[in-house]
Design a protein with these regions (language model features):
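N-terminal membrane topogenic signal
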Residues: 1-10, 27-28, 44-50, 94-96
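Alpha-helical transmembrane segments of polytopic membrane proteins
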Residues: 2-7, 27-35, 71-79, 128
Length: 180
């Protein structure tokens, strides 16, 4: 089993070196790839009960690194804050339809900001990442929350919404929360 793991780590290291050597993608991508490679090894070595929390934290660090490379630290903070707000609204202890109304109202305000009706305190770099992380995943999350289809925790929600590849790949496929 360790031999297979070593082979995967070697392939990941070679891939990382090739991406740097041939200047593939952006600097943010290269940093996130290096972070992912190191994170992969740590994640594999951790006991199972710590892995989802570690993945969530790794994803947040990747988001901060990717936005920071672009000089957009404030946007990373805004993205984390807005994401935390939406996750929090999904769990407010009020009737489910009232939670949906709060989320629809909040996202309606965000849509108005995106359309330029109201000024947003961040630049345009935030919107693609925010949409990729919350648009479709939010609907899946709310459905699974309503039907109790999967276990829910803050660690799992953070790992699900801020999932590491999404910060560099806004068109990353939608992941089913139950299968996550």
């Amino acid at each position: 089993d360790w031999l297979k793991f070593a082979a995967v780590v070697a392939q990941l290291a070679i891939l990382s070196l090739l991406v740097v050597a041939f200047n593939v993608e952006t600097q943010a991508f290269r940093y996130v790839l290096a972070l992912s490679a190191v994170g992969f090894v740590i994640h594999h070595l951790l006991p199972l009960r710590f892995r989802i929390t570690f993945f969530g934290l790794l994803s947040i660090v990747a988001l901060i690194v990717a936005f920071g490379v672009e000089g957009a630290w404030a946007e990373a903070v805004w993205l984390l804050g807005l994401g935390g707000l939406l996750i929090g609204l999904a769990h407010v202890p009020i009737p489910f339809l009232a939670r949906i109304a709060l989320i629809v109202g909040t996202t309606g305000g965000l849509m108005a900001m995106r359309a330029g009706v109201f000024p947003a305190p961040w630049n345009g770099l935030l919107w693609p990442a925010f949409g990729a992380m919350f648009m479709f995943r939010g609907m899946i999350y709310l459905y699974d929350l309503r039907t109790n289809a999967a276990p829910f925790s803050l660690s799992r929600a953070v790992a699900y919404f801020f999932m590491l590849p999404t910060v560099c790949f806004p068109l990353f496929p939608v992941i089913d929360y139950k299968a996550f």
